[in-house]
Amino acid sequence: MLRIDAMRAIYPQLERCVVVTIMGATAAELQSVGHRPNFFYLQHAMGLASSLGLGIALARPELKVVVFDGDGSILMNLGGLTTLARYRPTNLVHVVFDNESLLSVGGFPTATATGSDIAAMAAAAGVPRTATVRDLAAFVAAFEAALGAEQLTTLVAKVEAIGPKAFVTDLPLLENRFQFARYLKSL
């Protein structure tokens, strides 16, 4: 499964969510599918997308928050899983695209390439709903179930280590920040 295909498949559902995405390939691919003012591309903060998403979910419990993370990113901040589990926001869906590599910074293998299991780590940390999917149909079904579950979910999507030609977004970082803040204030 390609990460961009997974994002395209659920893109219509993201219109009604607050979306935080980690840097690099994930951010660039989501923007290439189509930018929306409810999307925040967290650049230069590897490992912190789940933390930012948690803060938004706790501050705005009436909003559905989706975090797009990567295996390299979440492995840099495993404490983020325990913090998610501690607070258990019912409005947060944490999607981890696991390509078993640090694709955006050179393609070096991550620990998941040798057997580490992010969904099992999330479950052991106390995240109430976890799943690992390996194909597009299973991803879409699991994502839809997570959106409707009203329970903190970490969904690990195993994807190919293929990304865009460039790992940057066209939207200036400050403009994204201000646009996203205006969006949240308007709700």
Regions found by a protein language model. Give the residues of each.
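Active-site-proximal loop->helix
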Residues: L78-Y87, V93, S104-M121
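Active-site diphosphate/adenylate-binding microenvironment
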Residues: M1-M46
